[in-house]
Curated annotation (Swiss-Prot):
GO annotation, biological process: carbohydrate metabolic process; pentose-phosphate shunt
Pfam families found in the cross-reference section: TAL_FSA
Pathway the protein takes part in: Carbohydrate degradation; pentose phosphate pathway; D-glyceraldehyde 3-phosphate and beta-D-fructose 6-phosphate from D-ribose 5-phosphate and D-xylulose 5-phosphate (non-oxidative stage): step 2/3
PROSITE patterns per UniProt: TRANSALDOLASE_1, TRANSALDOLASE_2
Major localization listed first in the record, in broad terms: cytoplasm
Catalytic site: K83
EC number: 2.2.1.2
Name the UniProt record assigns to this protein: Probable transaldolase
One annotated Gene Ontology cellular component of this protein: cytoplasm
UniProt-annotated location(s): Cytoplasm
Catalytic activity entry: D-sedoheptulose 7-phosphate + D-glyceraldehyde 3-phosphate = D-erythrose 4-phosphate + beta-D-fructose 6-phosphate
């Protein structure tokens, strides 16, 4: 499973990139708004840091405007993937953009049937939201499992991006369920690095070495 970072914060992306694990970045209007910068400026800078898929989301709610915005965003860099919300107008836009060779990531997926429709419309990626489903009492990982099984059964090439990831367990569960990608906040990536036994082991190695050589 590939690791993406879910943020528009350039410093977080830069730090995570240095770990050598990033295959891409996902952004959304809320994340861009937090940065207080022009979306094109932010996306251009992100593309200069990470050589992988960079999802940039349209703001429009009607097909024609989604397509127009998508075309403009796609011009920024060859790695741009256009993020489209799951809705009737969104599916229409995905079909048009896909016919032009522009990759799309259909977001706000909360059911396997939504994922199926997005895939058949031509989406390159679908993004089921784990955390938000957990919030309403539905185990988010179940949708990832169902989508992965359905896509495998029918030979669908659309990749699954586990989104709304809240903790390391979401990442582990996604990997075991067959998700192709997990897009992860920076703080969760840092949590994945840590384990108390690793820290204790490092401390013990240093203590033993220093004791042996009177350091």
């Amino acid at each position: 499973m590939k690791i993406f970072i879910d943020t528009a914060n350039v410093e977080e992306i830069r730090k995570a990139s240095k770990l050598g694990v990033l295959a891409g970045v996902t952004t959304n209007p809320s994340l861009i708004a937090k940065e207080g910068r022009d979306i094109k400026e932010v996306i251009e800078e992100i593309c200069s840091i990470v050589d992988g898929s960079i999802s940039a989301e349209v703001m429009a709610l009607e097909c024609d405007e989604m397509v127009r915005e998508g075309r403009e965003l796609a011009k920024i860099h060859k790695n741009i993937v256009i993020k489209i919300p799951m809705c009737e107008e969104g599916l229409k836009a995905v079909k048009v953009l896909a016919s032009e060779g522009i990759r799309t990531n259909v977001t706000l997926i909360f059911s396997p049937l939504q994922a199926l429709l997005a895939a058949r419309a031509g989406a390159s990626f679908v993004s089921p939201f784990l955390g938000r489903l957990d919030d309403i009492g539905n185990p988010g990982i179940e949708i990832v499992t169902q989508i992965a099984e359905m896509f495998a059964l029918h030979g669908i090439d659309t990749e699954i991006i586990s989104a709304s990831v809240r903790n390391p367990m979401h990442v582990l569960d996604s990997a075991m369920a067959g998700s192709h990608i997990a897009t992860i906040p920076y703080n969760v990536i840092l949590q994945m690095v840590k384990h108390p036994l690793t820290d204790a082991g490092m401390k013990k190695f240093i203590e033993d070495y220093n004791k042996a050589f009177n350091k």
